[in-house]
Amino acid sequence: DSIKIVHAPSNSINKGTQLVRASIKKLQIEKYNIEYVELQNMSNQVVLEHLKSSHIVLNQFYTFTPGLFGIEAMANHCAVLMSADPSIETGLPQDSKDAWLITKYWEVYDNLKYLLDNPEKIKQYADRGYDFAYKHYTYEAASEYINKVLKDNGVIE
């Protein structure tokens, strides 16, 4: 079976789409069994449908936060590669360093090849990302966080 890889850039320059395409092309030339799907100008519903059947998501490679698409990908149990880095963006939860494969723009090919060569790592990152998304980005998690902030600041008891 092929490994389905999705990239859904809202802005192809900011998301590193040219790097993604070059990496995918090189892996195809090397005969990796992959299905690459690039989704541009698609509704969120279409993107979410693709995420349900995807293994790896190539998010964005010039930013230091996961963004909504990164969270949606993790919540759909995909292994995510992106440049979001909690050592740079210190506002990210500390357990985020293991939730996705931190990938600088010059590492897209190498890190994607690493996952394809080590399929057990795809599942490992998918599991960690899924747990991370549901720990930090549900209505319940947001409610707990807001209540904690309000209590810590004496607004509510």
Segments predicted by a language model, with ranges:
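Short alpha-helical donor nucleotide-sugar binding micro-motif in glycosyltransferases
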Residues: 49-54
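Aromatic "clamp/platform" in nucleotide-sugar-dependent glycosyltransferases that forms part
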Residues: 61-62
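A charged, aromatic-enriched C-terminal amphipathic alpha-helix characteristic of glycosyltransferases
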Residues: 120-151
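Short hydrophobic beta-strand element within catalytic cores of glycosyltransferases
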Residues: 79-84
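Conserved donor-binding/catalytic core segment of Leloir-type glycosyltransferases
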Residues: 1-15, 21
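Short alpha-helical segment that forms part of, or immediately flanks, the ligand-binding pocket
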Residues: 48, 70-75, 89, 93
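A short alpha->beta transition loop at the rim of the catalytic pocket in nucleotide-sugar-dependent
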Residues: 55, 75-77
